[in-house]
Amino acid sequence: MLSLLDSVSLPYLILSACLSVILLRRFLAHDKGGSKSIAQGCLPEPRLRQWDPIFGFGIVISQARALRGHRYLEWLRDLHASMPHTKTFSANYGGYRWIFSIEPEILKAVYATNFQNFGVEPIRQHPPGFQPFAHKGVSTSDGDDWSFSRTLIKPFFERSVYVSTDRIKPFADKFMTLLPDDGETFDIQPLLQRWFLDITSEFIFGRSQDSMTHADRAEVTWAMADVLRGGRQRAQTHRILWAFNWDWWFEAVEKVHGFLNPYIRSTLKELEERQQRIKDGLPVDEERTDLLWSMATMLPDEEELRSQVCLIFVPNNDTTSMFIGHCLYFLARHSNAWKRLRDEVDAVGDAPITFEMLRNMKYLNGILNESMKPKPLSSKLTLALTTLCTPAHRLIPNNVTQVRAALSDVVLPLGGGPNGKAPLDVRKGDIVSVTKTVMYRDPDQWGPDANEYRPERWDGMRGGWHFLPYGGGPRRCPAQMMVQNESAYMLFRLAQKYSTIVARDPEPFRARMRIGPSSMHGVKIAFYK
């Protein structure tokens, strides 16, 4: 026996062992369904044809190349287009069974009906993809850890906070002073990012970064963008991290931590000193009201607090500014839509801009829901397609896919059988990924004009599981109304000031994936009063 082993090379033994483990796991997984799934009418789902059906590394590598080549949207569209006779199918993804779907009922099951059966820890926390950037937080945890993270932030997203337009006004006023003269071409995306960095830093840390006055203070924004871009790539290629050079990502993480650490350390020190003064019976100043202070009172550990703050501040610093940029990108290419928005704004007159007013403006909210659409998609372009708390709207949602891991065996209402209409047996460890942008362009849900930008389609339309901009069920984004209020306010102010918006970018839309898709070429426009 020993002589036989001596004649076999070590790499061959390792390869054979890996192959045996994967085959055994796949056999055991397919053997677990048993009589229970049969009794519920479950049928096998259609499976993607793969050149590497055993290890499933082919699809992992092709996705990694798409992300690095800024073709992720195209990759997702082509993936679903390759299975035209079903809305749900599976693939072997690095040895795991991934179930891809555009069925609203499956999204409903994952979000709400079977919420307890699905989680995010196996895909966002247990693999090393996000570390050392962050570990536990509202978007990476399940169970009690998730409930605690939600408790940390929930008070700051109550109605009394998100309805305020007074909080937005001074930052919008400053933003308006930075816009160039009539007819001058400029990229509005960096200005939007500086605006949102300032308003967010005041909300979270109690003092604004003031990057609209001091542009150099916005450098951390670019580091955060790299963290998000790399985080997505690492999360989706965590089984082959060794195949890539991640030095650039670790440098970005170090810059972001270097930005946050002084805020966190000074807050913890101030909190400790305040508590000591209270204990000694000494007078104290009025207590701070920012989010970081509130979180520190419940979580006074520096490393754990930083993880929680990272997963709130960094992803959400990118989303609202990117979302508004998407809306303007499209409005600059559709003059009639801008005119209709102007007419709605003019009809309000000089009335104060309030949350209730913005919520009742039908066309403005139609623009927010419909979001942005680039040039018409060719046969090779994706229907477009991330996950933390992000504004995900119809044509190019920031939340591109909704991915969950099965924490226990469960039966989904659809997905089985050759056309995906029978119940589907999902086993513990399987991954369910709902591709929102393909679902948001599905003619069966939206009609023959599903690929067209029509804000008016939302007039009288009721919501449903086929369109969930901010998620649903217990994990619904707590910042939904705040994002809507901030975005609506900024579009209102711009339409109030400028009669015309013109596109000045000859490049077709190409998405760079961060927390969601952003235009590689920015949003180059010109305004006219």
Swiss-Prot record:
<comment type="pathway">
    <text>Secondary metabolite biosynthesis.</text>
</comment>
<protein>
    <recommendedName>
        <fullName>Cytochrome P450 monooxygenase tenA</fullName>
        <ecNumber>1.-.-.-</ecNumber>
    </recommendedName>
</protein>
<feature type="transmembrane region" description="Helical">
    <location>
        <begin position="8"/>
        <end position="24"/>
    </location>
</feature>
<dbReference type="InterPro" id="IPR001128">
    <property type="entry name" value="Cyt_P450"/>
</dbReference>
<dbReference type="GO" id="GO:0016705">
    <property type="term" value="F:oxidoreductase activity, acting on paired donors, with incorporation or reduction of molecular oxygen"/>
</dbReference>
<dbReference type="GO" id="GO:0020037">
    <property type="term" value="F:heme binding"/>
</dbReference>
<dbReference type="InterPro" id="IPR002401">
    <property type="entry name" value="Cyt_P450_E_grp-I"/>
</dbReference>
<keyword id="KW-0479">Metal-binding</keyword>
<keyword id="KW-0472">Membrane</keyword>
<feature type="binding site" description="axial binding residue">
    <location>
        <position position="477"/>
    </location>
    <ligand>
        <name>heme</name>
    </ligand>
</feature>
<comment type="function">
    <text>Cytochrome P450 monooxygenase; part of the gene cluster that mediates the biosynthesis of tenellin-type 2-pyridones, iron-chelating compounds involved in iron stress tolerance, competition with the natural competitor fungus Metarhizium robertsii and insect hosts infection. TenA catalyzes an oxidative ring expansion of pretenellin A and 14-hydropretellenin A to form the 2-pyridone core, leading to the production of pretenellin B and pyridovericin, respectively.</text>
</comment>
<keyword id="KW-0812">Transmembrane</keyword>
<keyword id="KW-0560">Oxidoreductase</keyword>
<dbReference type="GO" id="GO:0004497">
    <property type="term" value="F:monooxygenase activity"/>
</dbReference>
<comment type="similarity">
    <text>Belongs to the cytochrome P450 family.</text>
</comment>
<dbReference type="InterPro" id="IPR036396">
    <property type="entry name" value="Cyt_P450_sf"/>
</dbReference>
<dbReference type="GO" id="GO:0005506">
    <property type="term" value="F:iron ion binding"/>
</dbReference>
<dbReference type="GO" id="GO:0016020">
    <property type="term" value="C:membrane"/>
</dbReference>
<keyword id="KW-0503">Monooxygenase</keyword>
<keyword id="KW-0408">Iron</keyword>
<dbReference type="InterPro" id="IPR047146">
    <property type="entry name" value="Cyt_P450_E_CYP52_fungi"/>
</dbReference>
<keyword id="KW-1133">Transmembrane helix</keyword>
<dbReference type="Pfam" id="PF00067">
    <property type="entry name" value="p450"/>
</dbReference>
